[in-house]
Amino acid sequence: MKRLATLSLLFLFLGTLAVLIPKEAKGQSAGLVSAVLNRMERNRQSLKSLRSGISMEKYNAQLRDTDRYNGIVLYMPAAGRDASVRIEWQSPQHEILAVSKGKYTLFRPRLNQAIVGNKNSVKGKAGAGGIVEMMYMSRQQLEARFQPLQDVREETLWGNVSTIHLTLVPKSNSSFKYAEIWVDSLGMPVQTKIVEKNDDATTMRLTGLEKNVKISPDEFSIKLDANVKIVKG
């Protein structure tokens, strides 16, 4: 179920497009924090669709080993919990994950297998705890759950992308230690890093962003051949 964890983490990543971050700490780069929050809000309001490259690094702290993945992601926000997402991993193996109308399909061509299920069931099976919930939390819930913003600073990512770096630390028990977000000059979160309690870490990066391009709703539905084995997730 490792790819289901990917789904949870992606929702956290894309969820930063749609939620408000907790209030900043007094005296901690207040002007910088205010500016980046304003950019994020403007980006959230203007974003109707997104197509981009996506890379992911999953670090295993026990083995001190990193797995790397590359692909393409499509994202279309919607009211409530109905945002649509499609990730097509191109390496190291071809897999397609589509989420729409509260359902997900994970298609593995090499196995001729598709895992299908309710998106809300992912968090329990993915080992990612309440990560999915973060996408839908209100500002009040976020402020209750997270400490004030930490480690607020300017940082240039590879590809010469200028960003503001933010760190979110849960106030109480959570499935992860902390989350880091890198926001570009237009208010777009272009990179996130989730560090779990066992020090495993997942870093996601968006590249070649195309905002507000026309995306057909059909992109979020995978047409499966009759001979594909269906597994309930």
Each language-model region and where it sits:
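Acidic/charged, solvent-exposed loop-and-adjacent secondary-structure segments enriched in E/D, K/R, S/T
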Residues: 105-137
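Bacterial N-terminal signal peptides that target proteins for export
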Residues: 1-10
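Beta-turn initiation residues at beta-strand->coil junctions
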Residues: 56, 107-110, 193-197
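C-terminal segment of classical bacterial N-terminal signal peptides
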Residues: 14-24
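Gly/Pro-enriched, hydrophobic low-complexity segments
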Residues: 30, 115, 148-233
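N-terminal mature ectodomain segment of secretory-pathway/periplasmic proteins
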Residues: 33-38, 42-106
